[in-house]
Each structure stands twice: as structure tokens, then as C-alpha cells.
Amino acid sequence: TIDTCSSDSPLSCQTDNEASCCFNSPGGSLLQTQFWDYDPSDGPSDSWTIHGLWPDNCDGSYQEYCDDSREYSNITSILEAQDRTELLSYMKEYWPDYEGADEDESFWEHEWNKHGTCINTIDPSCYTDYYAQEEVGDFFQQVVDLFKTLDSYTALSDAGITPSEDATYKLSDIEDALAAIHDGYPPYVGCEDGALSQLYYYFNVKGSAIGGTYVASERLEDSNCKGSGIKYPPKSSS
């Protein structure tokens, strides 16, 4: 099991502590990233879907593919071996690959190999009685748990921003609606072809990335959307 950290562990990116199992560094800015996949449509029609959990450096740069020895090509079987069947079925629904279900596994592999291996607080050395790939299951569970606290679809809907073939929206209204579920901090809002496509919610973390305290923080990248006329196309029901 992962070692426990004290509740008064320092907050990442807010002090220059040495990296440790209880201090995320250099990747101290943790981003929970989401997709709105409408072309082709993916995931439930009334929910955004998971992209990942990324450890960005505190200046917005990032490392990637940090540990060749822990790159895996069998995420599904790792989770099954850990009896994480409920997690796996949730991921199939809310963490799908836009190219289709047969690509889900490669998408999950990509997210772990590129980003998960760079989270220093889930290194095997941070575990007691570690067993191989234990941190992989913990990573995917943590991403899902964090995603469940960030219901972007409902936050937008509560502000009157709903998928539509013809309505368009203002960036400031979108940001305000999403800031309401993120302690007043708007996420990065990403557009493609003038339509909503991605969200990045930024956090600093007290303690480990697994089970630590995620504290909403300012985004390190400005939206690439225009100020108004933003489309939010419905997902097709097929």
C-alpha cells in the first residue's frame, strides 16, 4: 500500500521543498483533463469524458515518458488482476478513445506511460509491501475519483449552457460556470474549429497524488477559444 502522508504536508508548487513521496515535484501542478467528443461521438451524451491526469511543472512545462521500465501495454489485464472490475467498467464508459472501444486500451496505456510514470509520489519506492504494477491501479482509480468531482456537463447546464446545433456561447460565461465547481478558478477551455473540445482543471496537491488533498489552483495556460460565438455541438445519439 502507498505510504501515508501527514495532513499538514506542504502544498505542491507553493514551496520549494525537495521532491519526496509526500511532495509532488517537479510535476506539482496536476491537471484533470476532459474531452467533449462529438465528432465522432464518444461517451454518454450528458457527460464530458476523461482525458487524463497530467503532472505539469509549476511553470506549465512538463516531462513525459519518465520511466521506460514501467511502461505497460496491458492496462486492462493489470486492472483485472487487481480485481478493479468496477473501475474498469467505469473507464469503458467515461474514459473511451474517440477511435472506438477497441482503442481504449491503447489510450489508457498512452496516458499511463506518458503522464502516470512522471508522478513522483507514486513511484514504487513510495509503497510498503509493494507488488508489481500496484501504482498503476492506484493511478487510474485516482483519475476517476477526481473526474467524478468535476461534473462539467452539469455545471454548464446549470448556467444554461447546453449542447445545441445552433446556439453559441460566450467564453466568459463558460469559464464562470466551470469555475463554480473549481473553487472559483476557471479551467483551461480548449476549442477546436470554434467548438468546445477540452478542459484542463489545475490543482496543487498536499501529500501524495494518490489520496492526497487536491486544492484547486489557477490555470497555467489561457483558453484558445474566441471570446464569443463558441459552439457546443450535441453528441450524436447513435
UniProtKB/Swiss-Prot annotation:
Q: What is its EC number?
A: 4.6.1.19
Catalytic activity, reaction form = a ribonucleotidyl-ribonucleotide-RNA + H2O = a 3'-end 3'-phospho-ribonucleotide-RNA + a 5'-end dephospho-ribonucleoside-RNA + H(+)
Q: Which residues are glycosylated?
A: 74
Q: Which UniProt keywords apply?
A: Disulfide bond, Endonuclease, Glycoprotein, Hydrolase, Lyase, Nuclease
One GO MF term: RNA binding
The text of the family note is: Belongs to the RNase T2 family.
Q: What is this protein called?
A: Ribonuclease M
Query: What organism is recorded for this protein?
Result: Aspergillus phoenicis (Aspergillus saitoi)
